[in-house]
Every structure is written in C-alpha cells, then in structure tokens.
Amino acid sequence: MHELSIATDLINTALETAKQNNAREVISITVEIGELALINPEQLQFMYQVLTEENLLKGSELIIINVPAVAECQCGYKGPVPDKTTCACPNCGLTMRAVEGRDICLKTMEIEV
C-alpha cells in the first residue's frame, strides 16, 4: 500500500506550502494522478483524512484529477494505452514508452490567509 507514503508526501508538501504563504486554513488541495501511477484514489482519500486530523489540513478537501495514460511507439503510434500490463502498441505489438499519465503532482491549493 504505497498510498500511505504518497499521502504523507502530499501532506508534507502542502503543509510547507501553507506555512510559506502564512495560511490560517487550507480549504482544498488538488492533485493530478497519472493512470500508470497505480494509485487507488479511495485509499489515498482515506489516508489523507486520517493523516490530516491533527494539523492545518484538517477538514480540507482532497481533489483528485485522473490523468489518462498516453504512450508512443517506434512505429509512430501515439495515444492511449489499451493494455496497461504490457504497454504493447495496438498497431505493431512493440512495447511503448509512456509520455503522460505516470506522475503524481500537487497542482493547486486553496488557502485562507
């Protein structure tokens, strides 16, 4: 369950950002999660709620935006990844290279100062 470590990292980043901006309250944080990051959004939400009970993020909303996987192949194909387990190109069968949908990124925060 790597959602715990992801939630911890997101919370630490959000707390540091809130501190740097003299926030009195954090209303929400928005996170983009790539399809290939293999994160369970429900588990991440749960971990976020548990880990924010005793800090400035208590009561804040975690907004998750799913980013679809996009890959490209030597044959020229660029698009969705139909088979996430092998990343095989739908045109030629070669293994594709992911170009989008791998990352986890804290995009925005809504705060009260």
UniProtKB/Swiss-Prot annotation:
- In this chain, Zn(2+) is annotated as bound at C73, C75, C89, C92
Q: Which UniProt keywords apply?
A: Metal-binding, Nickel, Zinc
Q: Which residues bind Ni(2+)?
A: H2
Q: Which GO terms describe its biological process?
A: protein maturation; protein modification process
Please give the Gene3D superfamilies that the UniProt record associates with this protein. Answer: 3.30.2320.80
Please name one Pfam family that this protein belongs to: HypA
What Gene Ontology terms describe what this protein does at the molecular function level? Answer: nickel cation binding; zinc ion binding
Q: Which domain of life is it from?
A: Archaea
Q: What does this protein do?
A: Involved in the maturation of [NiFe] hydrogenases. Required for nickel insertion into the metal center of the hydrogenase.
Q: Which family does it belong to?
A: Belongs to the HypA/HybF family.
Its recorded name reads Hydrogenase maturation factor HypA
